[in-house]
Amino acid sequence: MPLPVSITTLLLDIEGTTTPVDFVFKVLFPYARDRVADFLATQGADPEVQADLDLLRQEYAQEAAAELPDWAGEDAIAAVPYIQWLIDSDRKSTGLKSLQGKIWEQGYVSGEIKGQLFADVLPAFQRWQAAGLAIAIFSSGSVQAQQLLFGYSEAGDLSPHLSGYFDTRTGPKREAASYGAIAAQLGKAPAQVLFVSDIPAELEAAATAGFQTRLSLRPGNATVEIGDWTTIHSFDEL
């Protein structure tokens, strides 16, 4: 189904929408998990890293999970078991996402990591931009991680095509208020924004806020209940 004429902005999820799910789980997560101890040993005194650790400690104090690992000691390295537990649990922790972004930056800059995108992403970005449409990202990954993925992608630097990045600091992806906040920051009426995601609960929140939506059905995505959602298999359909 072509884009509705009322749409002026596309708001895109990353995992399962612009990027294969496997890239996140088989490349990014293991990269951060394997390197977090060395990273904290060398960068743990950095004020920005300390801010991430302070946030993680606040989250740790509120955890109720029975299998929660110990966080014993004040030095940065003491946080490693909890951080690895969060990664293994795929927790949407703001502190974790921020710290992961800093670790991934080293991989992207060194060339060890290249952001993976579906083949239709760059042509779609070029087409939408030529049509005068704005493109923004909303992901549970930190803004820094988003900028790295698109700035160091296999298709080159796609950042000139993007006009905004939003993460969980704006709000949870499954709460309508988050989408209202994004529309306000973009300076758009909610009905002018099309949100594309592979998660129906996120689409529900966006629709509640007045956004138009599309359910992304990409290869490798988890099976979901399609229900009444309008679906796409490729950005070629938009």
UniProtKB/Swiss-Prot annotation:
The reactions it catalyses are:
5-methylsulfanyl-2,3-dioxopentyl phosphate + H2O = 1,2-dihydroxy-5-(methylsulfanyl)pent-1-en-3-one + phosphate
Q: Does the keyword Ligase apply?
A: no
Pfam short name (any one): Hydrolase
Gene Ontology terms describing biological process: L-methionine salvage from methylthioadenosine
Cofactor: binding comment: Binds 1 Mg(2+) ion per subunit.
Cofactor(s) the record lists: Mg(2+)
The UniProt keywords, alphabetically, are:
Amino-acid biosynthesis, Hydrolase, Magnesium, Metal-binding, Methionine biosynthesis
Q: What class of enzyme is it?
A: hydrolase
Task: State the pathway, as annotated in the record.
Answer: Amino-acid biosynthesis; L-methionine biosynthesis via salvage pathway; L-methionine from S-methyl-5-thio-alpha-D-ribose 1-phosphate: step 3/6; Amino-acid biosynthesis; L-methionine biosynthesis via salvage pathway; L-methionine from S-methyl-5-thio-alpha-D-ribose 1-phosphate: step 4/6
Q: Which GO terms describe its molecular function?
A: 2,3-diketo-5-methylthiopentyl-1-phosphate enolase activity; 2-hydroxy-3-keto-5-methylthiopentenyl-1-phosphate phosphatase activity; acireductone synthase activity; magnesium ion binding
Record EC number: 3.1.3.77
- SUPFAM superfamilies for the chain: HAD-like
From what superkingdom does this record's organism come? Bacteria
PANTHER family in alphabetical order:
ENOLASE-PHOSPHATASE E1 (PTHR20371:SF1)
| Oligomeric and partner information | Monomer.
Q: Which family does it belong to?
A: Belongs to the HAD-like hydrolase superfamily. MasA/MtnC family.
Q: Under what name is this protein listed?
A: Enolase-phosphatase E1
Gene name for this UniProt entry: mtnC
